[in-house]
């Protein structure tokens, strides 16, 4: 059970701008330099998708053809542009206006240092990126096209890191636009923040969110073969510290939990879904509220999952899982539960009754246990119990439906070890230090209308989510080490004004 590589077969096209004015020899040098640069970037190991160099762009027709092909190719997740020489920006207009893939402008050059003693006009004519990129940047800004700008010599490690982070955001956007979310049941009764406009979500994020009757899941449960259940149980035994009682007197409960996982996975795969959500108020004839199965959605399958009908967080977890593929850490549903208000040691503890995923990293081998659950009205559910592994500069991200648009809200946090054993707490959890402080972070979070459900990512941090929000054209409010409550409130007011004016459809 291994998550499919979301970067397999995916490409980022590299378009280099120039013009015929400079002659064949100059254009030959442009092509040689561009190939050297792309080869170097591909060999850094920091960019998870392959960068593919396309023929030098020298005309309006060539640019449009390039952009149309990139937009139509399902394997292309993004486009990088760079102008080696001066490239008149009017020739980019028609192409840029038909581009539907994420755009990154790389402001770089082939040479690292100015050749002080030998530089002449031939060199100047060939190496004009410093003003070629400004010309290109002007037209992109004039057209109102959002893009990421990365500046630096192509051999600078920071350049490859930023390109790699952006490539991950592109993959997250690709996953979002190909996502189907399976809802078993509806939203938890009377809860506000987990509601949302599913039609608007498909317009904005490309994700198709639909409901399947819980009775269909029950039918899938009844159809599961014992061999599939036993295979899943063997996987449990290999990866977790299984309570001996579950292999003896409570084996039937373990079998049921594994069978529920198999049923959910079978339904998801049969319908091409990559995120799911259930609701403890709507379980039909299921024997248990699913626990260990949903916990494994992000870690084993790379899927999103959330609880209580909260499809918005399930979408975020899937996006986070894709963006973080191949990195240490992962993505999981998280819910704020309790504060530690000790002066100088302020902490937030997040958890959920069953569904927090070990994908975020665990301090010790997760324990597979069975405990009573006071809600849902079903048999005692089997769940993984662990504490999240410490991680610097992790993030918690929420999505709220604020009437005419969606708002993403993010807090940068440091996950830390719990200060006690938590031996009486029969569920998975994580403890973190919010930035800039617990009081400021919570005040800002509440002011922005952030959800109590979040997606925690320990694999990718702030920049990946900022890149994703820019690509999606969605508001993102950020709480970090530099945030003050007064400044945040003012920025939020300006952001609300901008997004309300900019989201008139």
Curated annotation (Swiss-Prot):
User: GO MF annotations for this entry?
Assistant: L-arabinose isomerase activity; manganese ion binding
Highest taxon above the source species: Bacteria
Mind telling me which Pfam families this protein's record contains? AraA_central, AraA_N, Arabinose_Iso_C
Q: Name one GO biological process term.
A: L-arabinose catabolic process to xylulose 5-phosphate
Q: State if Isomerase is listed as a keyword.
A: yes
GO CC terms for this protein?
cytosol
**Its biological purpose:** Catalyzes the conversion of L-arabinose to L-ribulose.
Similarity-based family: Belongs to the arabinose isomerase family.
- For this entry, the protein name equals L-arabinose isomerase
Point out the gene that encodes the protein. araA
């Amino acid at each position: 059970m291994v998550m499919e590589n979301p970067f397999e077969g995916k490409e980022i096209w590299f378009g280099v701008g120039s013009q015929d004015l400079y002659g064949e020899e100059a254009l030959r040098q442009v092509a040689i330099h561009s190939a050297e640069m792309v080869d170097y970037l591909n060999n850094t190991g920091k960019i998870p998708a392959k960068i593919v160099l396309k023929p030098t762009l020298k005309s309006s027709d060539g640019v449009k053809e390039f952009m149309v092909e990139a937009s139509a190719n399902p394997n292309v997740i993004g486009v990088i542009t760079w102008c080696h020489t001066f490239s008149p920006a009017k020739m980019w207009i028609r192409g840029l206006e038909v581009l539907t893939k994420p755009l990154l402008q790389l402001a770089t050059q082939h040479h690292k240092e100015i050749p002080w003693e030998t530089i002449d006009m031939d060199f100047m004519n060939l190496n004009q990126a410093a003003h070629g990129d400004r010309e290109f940047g002007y037209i992109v800004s004039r057209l109102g096209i959002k893009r990421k700008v990365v500046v630096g010599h192509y051999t600078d490690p920071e350049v490859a890191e930023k390109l790699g982070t952006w490539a991950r955001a592109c993959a997250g956007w690709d996953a979002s636009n190909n996502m189907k979310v399976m809802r078993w049941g509806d939203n938890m009764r009377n809860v506000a923040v987990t509601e949302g406009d599913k039609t608007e979500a498909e317009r904005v994020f490309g994700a198709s969110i639909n409901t399947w009757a819980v009775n269909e899941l029950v039918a899938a449960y009844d159809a599961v073969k014992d061999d599939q259940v036993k295979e899943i149980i063997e996987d449990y035994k290999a990866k977790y510290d299984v309570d001996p009682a579950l292999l003896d007197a409570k084996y039937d409960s373990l079998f049921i939990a594994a069978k529920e996982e198999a049923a959910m996975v079978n339904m998801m795969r049969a319908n091409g879904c990559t995120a799911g959500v259930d609701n403890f108020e709507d379980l039909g004839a299921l024997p248990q509220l699913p626990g260990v199965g949903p916990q494994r959605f992000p870690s084993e399958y790379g899927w999103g999952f959330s609880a209580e009908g909260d499809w918005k967080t399930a979408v975020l977890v899937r996006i986070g899982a894709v963006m973080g593929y191949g990195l240490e850490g992962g993505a999981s549903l998280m819910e704020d539960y309790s504060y530690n208000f000790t002066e100088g040691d302020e902490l937030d503890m997040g958890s959920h009754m069953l569904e927090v995923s070990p994908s975020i990293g665990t301090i010790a081998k997760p324990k597979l246990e069975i405990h009573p659950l006071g809600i849902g009205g079903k048999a005692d559910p089997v769940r993984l119990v662990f504490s999240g592994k410490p991680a610097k500069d992790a993030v918690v991200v929420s999505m709220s439906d604020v009437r005419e648009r969606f708002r993403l809200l993010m807090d940068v946090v440091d996950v830390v070890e719990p200060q006690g054993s938590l031996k009486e707490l029969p569920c998975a959890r994580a403890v973190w230090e919010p930035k800039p402080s617990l009081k400021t972070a919570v005040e800002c979070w509440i002011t922005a209308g952030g959800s109590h459900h979040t997606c925690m990512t320990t694999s990718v941090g702030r920049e990946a989510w900022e890149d994703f929000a820019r690509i999606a054209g969605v508001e993102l409010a950020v709480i970090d080490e530099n945030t003050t409550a007064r400044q945040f409130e003012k920025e939020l007011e300006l952001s609300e004004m901008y997004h309300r004016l900019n989201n008139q459809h």
